[in-house]
């Protein structure tokens, strides 16, 4: 007689996942992604050397908070030793919550300095009402931070510009200054005295915003220039957002193109010797007429018409 096995009980529905656990996992993945991108940028451009004293410029915005957080995490497992000091420039803007950053940095245990310099009054006095303050404010802020770096033995100055900033700057230079230029991930200042690094060069702004929200950084809004409407950078930013919406990945493609420059396919005579094209080996330069002769011939042809 064949035994009849009892039918198995139907499987109970699995317990629903705790949304808090899912959120924590997503935040963990995002944090690891940002760490990987920051580490890659540091490696690709040689941003940090053994013994560096890095001044982390902290404005109170999402970008600089994220940059400091990433550098602190990487510092614990970095292949070379380096130190960090967070520096905020108190520009004496009205209603600026001066207590926020010291309280946050004290709780974090990070060495920091607050540099007080009333650039707000200067900008407000010099820039006409209704005009953009960003350019002058940026120059004054940069001068104050460079002066601090000079007197405190800083070897690298870390700024919180991200990938979207770099691409937007490229288009601003293209549209308004007729030049192909963006923000270098690493550069030497114009006076040659300082090395500036941008550890967030590979990180998208949307990911920074999500990370800052997850970490609940005490964000301080900029009431000086951040509130001005119709700024060129905002307009370019909206254009890039629209492009990314219409064709996801387009901004990433543009960013990668900045690292694949081909001078022979452009028209900058200082970067590529177009006059040498057509020579073979060590042949001497062609005995071509002076370029001015072509202009003279062109004018003569025009006159004869």
UniProtKB/Swiss-Prot annotation:
A motif (PP-loop motif) lies at residues 59-64. It comes from the Bacteria. GO terms for cellular component: cytoplasm. SUPFAM superfamilies: Adenine nucleotide alpha hydrolases-like (SSF52402). Residues 282-293 have a biased composition (Low complexity). It catalyses: cytidine(32) in tRNA + S-sulfanyl-L-cysteinyl-[cysteine desulfurase] + AH2 + ATP = 2-thiocytidine(32) in tRNA + L-cysteinyl-[cysteine desulfurase] + A + AMP + diphosphate + H(+). Pathway: tRNA modification. Residues 1-20, 282-305 are annotated as: Disordered. Binds 1 [4Fe-4S] cluster per subunit. The cluster is chelated by three Cys residues, the fourth Fe has a free coordination site that may bind a sulfur atom transferred from the persulfide of IscS. One of its GO terms (molecular function) is magnesium ion binding. CDD domains: TtcA-like. Its EC number is 2.8.1.-. Its cofactor is Mg(2+); [4Fe-4S] cluster. One of its GO terms (biological process) is tRNA thio-modification. The keyword Oxidoreductase does not apply. Belongs to the TtcA family. Catalyzes the ATP-dependent 2-thiolation of cytidine in position 32 of tRNA, to form 2-thiocytidine (s(2)C32). The sulfur atoms are provided by the cysteine/cysteine desulfurase (IscS) system. Homodimer. The thiolation reaction likely consists of two steps: a first activation step by ATP to form an adenylated intermediate of the target base of tRNA, and a second nucleophilic substitution step of the sulfur (S) atom supplied by the hydrosulfide attached to the Fe-S cluster. HAMAP family: TtcA. This is tRNA-cytidine(32) 2-sulfurtransferase. It comes from Xanthomonas oryzae pv. oryzae (strain PXO99A).
């Amino acid at each position: 007689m064949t035994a009849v096995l009892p039918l198995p009980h139907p499987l109970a529905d699995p317990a629903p996942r705790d949304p808090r656990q899912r959120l924590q996992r997503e935040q963990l993945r995002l944090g690891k992604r940002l760490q990987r991108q920051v580490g890659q940028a540091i490696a690709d451009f040689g941003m940090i050397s053994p013994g560096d004293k890095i001044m982390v410029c902290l404005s109170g915005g999402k970008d600089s908070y994220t940059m400091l957080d990433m550098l602190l995490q990487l510092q614990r497992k970095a292949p070379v030793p380096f130190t960090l000091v967070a520096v905020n420039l108190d520009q004496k803007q009205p209603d600026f919550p001066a207590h926020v950053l010291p309280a946050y940095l004290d709780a974090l245990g990070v060495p920091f300095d607050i540099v007080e310099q009333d650039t707000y009054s200067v900008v407000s006095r010099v820039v006409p009402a209704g005009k953009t303050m960003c350019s002058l404010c940026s120059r004054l802020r940069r001068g104050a931070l460079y002066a601090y770096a000079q007197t405190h033995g800083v070897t690298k100055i870390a700024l919180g510009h991200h990938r979207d900033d770099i691409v937007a700057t490229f288009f601003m230079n293209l549209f308004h200054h007729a030049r192909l230029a963006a923000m270098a991930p690493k550069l030497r200042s114009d006076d040659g005295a300082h090395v500036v690094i941008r550890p967030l060069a590979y990180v998208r702004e949307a990911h920074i915003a999500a990370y800052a929200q997850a970490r609940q950084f005490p964000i301080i809004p900029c009431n000086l220039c951040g509130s001005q409407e119709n700024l060129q950078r905002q307009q370019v930013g909206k254009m890039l957002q629209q492009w990314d919406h219409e064709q996801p990945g387009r901004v990433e493609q543009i960013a990668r193109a900045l690292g694949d420059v081909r001078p022979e396919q452009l028209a900058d005579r200082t970067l590529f010797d177009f006059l040498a094209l057509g020579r073979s080996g060590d042949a001497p330069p062609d005995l071509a007429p002076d370029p001015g002769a072509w202009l003279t011939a062109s004018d003569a042809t025009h006159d004869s018409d």
